[in-house]
């Protein structure tokens, strides 16, 4: 006979069936991330850092539950059900808390299961009209996309733009990408790459090269969330046009998959060029400085227009034929009238290796973009990816700690593929990166200050 569950019961003693029920409540919308960042060591420090969270996240690809693994790992510290319930209530997971200790849950708490709540919210999500048009020249943008009206703070700050985007049919995009040929471009196919929310293909429209992003639902992303990101990308692009932001040409919403069509970026992403993908020559230090400044200019334009990108990373910094930096991928961007204030979201999104501590707690603030850009600056200096499980330290941002502890210097990490880097400007860029990576968001510079520091670096 099972023993009754009390506040002093160890979490590690909970049976598998109960853990599975808890996971059913917490796994959706990545609720486990909220718990993970709230768990502390006895010293008060965070028990789980970005790397730990990335490891839990990877379990989704194998069909496993991050919540189950989190509770198993935390359970090894002899935490109790009382500790867990306190954490669940603090994060408003009332339904799973009531499974464990019903009397501990406030009587006024809404214990609607999270999956039900998601369904209710999704039914109310606006989505764009699905217009069909025949193929016309890209420059004749006859079909316009009108962002859905909303009274929410996020959409209030977005005025409807008269910018016109072409509405492609899905059939047309299949034709111009050779039926979305999955073979890489290097072997004669059309596939340029893939990311968290879809695959990008090279296409040709009226003798113009374009990039077609076909959105696809990932393991932890619902179809409705994907539609919402499609919608958001178009809204941001309608509002924000700048030399250092990618240019959206059109979209397709009438077929099996949602698609976005962009101006083609012949030099790919900063991530690819830093890794010299496909045998491309390494970027010079001079070129890297130019790219850093361009990316900062793009982020500044977004922030000036009250938008927070939320997924700044080297893979989302694209390079045109002149290696001009173009910020891309605005599906996660948020807008707010109260831009200077921090707002909260139950949906924690972004790329873990670039995420600021507060972003992992669900806070939305422009200072999180600054933190992510700090990681990008480290990539520019070192030529190393933001995360590598076969490297020590595995997270690139942790080299800051090694340098501060005087175990190493930034010279130890400079990309040896460069031959024109001078120590003064490298140290200046590292200083900017270090400021951007401050644990406390209010101690980080704003993007205007980052721009100024980068300009001073190249002028000196």
Swiss-Prot record:
Keywords: Acetylation, ATP-binding, Cytoplasm, Disease variant, Immunity, Innate immunity, Kinase, Magnesium, Nucleotide-binding, Phosphoprotein, Serine/threonine-protein kinase, Transferase. The active site is at 311 (proton acceptor). One of its GO terms (molecular function) is kinase activity. Its EC number is 2.7.11.1. It comes from the Eukaryota. Residues 20-104 form the Death domain. It holds the Pfam family PK_Tyr_Ser-Thr. It is an enzyme of class 2 (transferase). InterPro entries: DEATH-like_dom_sf (IPR011029), IRAK4 (IPR017428), IRAK4_Death (IPR037970), Kinase-like_dom_sf (IPR011009), LRR_Rcpt-Like_S/T_Kinase (IPR051824), Prot_kinase_dom (IPR000719), Ser-Thr/Tyr_kinase_cat_dom (IPR001245). Changing residue 20 to W: Increases inhibition of NF-kappa-B complex activation; decreases interaction with MYD88; decreases protein stability. It is linked to Immunodeficiency 67: An autosomal recessive primary immunodeficiency characterized by recurrent, life-threatening systemic and invasive bacterial infections beginning in infancy or early childhood. Belongs to the protein kinase superfamily. TKL Ser/Thr protein kinase family. Pelle subfamily. This is Interleukin-1 receptor-associated kinase 4. It comes from Homo sapiens. The gene is IRAK4.
